[in-house]
UniProtKB/Swiss-Prot annotation:
S-S bonds: none
Protein name, entry field: UPF0257 lipoprotein YnfC
Coiled coil: none
Transmembrane segments: none
Gene name for this UniProt entry: ynfC
Family membership noted in the UniProt record: Belongs to the UPF0257 family.
Top-level division of the source organism's lineage: Bacteria
Keyword Transmembrane on entry: no
Membrane topology, record value: Lipid-anchor
One Gene Ontology CC term in the entry: plasma membrane
Chief subcellular location: membrane
Organism: Salmonella typhimurium (strain LT2 / SGSC1412 / ATCC 700720)
UniProt keyword annotations, A-Z: Cell membrane, Lipoprotein, Membrane, Palmitate, Signal
Pfam families in alphabetical order: UPF0257
UniProt signal peptide: 1-16
Length: 236
């Protein structure tokens, strides 16, 4: 037997030789929080992370940072939307997330550490048998969320008294490149926007650097916005 073939067979038997790590599904908490707080979901034993969205001029438009326990619960989550001058910082305390500055109870939890209610806004979340948030109900709206078999978010539909807004995402066929996706936004039956993202990935199949193009089709002619996303991820 030739030596290269022997080495190949040994690699297959031992499942080593620098093969990528086996894929892990997205946890219910990671998938659901990414849906609700608008960031890219991550796989594997994430300890802490940051995602920074930058405009084509190199200016920071949005940043999300979080720390997680070994059980996959978000211990802290901080969001800064510089384009809209909004922000949020949450810290886990038993069955609630508190405001990190005022310590006011903001988000009520269910199960291990899943979203249950946002009392100040009158919003409640419902989960499926696997623990994924599948709907959010408020005073004047309802949101329904969709996932694939790995827990990857496939979009959502928001229904209120005026219209129905739907976002439908289609990830790459390559299971290791889930964050390479296209998405279409519609108001009722009218397409109003589309998004395309492509990324480079680490050994856990998590995105490291991404390029994001958002096209606003609600105006004529349509306007494209180009962004880059820088991810820093530490693992247990």
């Amino acid at each position: 037997m030739k030596k290269p073939l022997l080495l190949t067979l040994l690699c297959m038997i031992l499942a080593g030789c620098d093969n990528p790590k086996s894929l892990e599904s997205f946890t219910p908490e990671m998938a659901s929080f990414s849906n609700e707080f608008d960031f890219d979901p991550l796989r594997g034993p994430v300890k802490d992370f940051s995602q920074t969205l930058m405009s084509e001029n190199g200016e920071v438009a949005k940043q999300v940072t979080g720390t997680l326990s070994q059980e996959g619960c978000f211990d802290t989550l901080e969001l800064h939307d510089l384009e809209n001058n909004t922000g949020l910082a949450l810290v886990l305390d038993a069955n609630y997330y508190r405001d990190a500055q005022t310590l006011e109870k903001k988000v009520q939890l269910q199960g291990k550490c899943q979203l249950a209610a946002l009392p100040s806004a009158g919003v409640t979340w419902e989960t499926d048998d696997n623990g994924f948030v599948v709907s959010a109900t408020g005073k004047e709206m309802k949101v329904e969320y969709r996932y694939d078999s790995e827990g990857y978010p496939l979009g959502k539909t928001t229904i209120n008294s005026q219209n129905t807004l739907s976002v439908t995402a289609k990830p790459s066929a390559d299971p290791r490149k889930k964050l390479d996706y296209t998405a279409v936004s519609r108001v009722d039956d009218r397409q109003v926007g589309n998004v395309t993202q492509s990324c480079e990935y680490d050994a856990y199949a998590n995105p490291v650097d991404c390029r994001l193009v958002i096209v606003d089709e609600s105006v004529k002619p349509a306007v494209s916005h180009h962004y880059t996303i820088k991810n820093r991820i530490d693992y247990y």
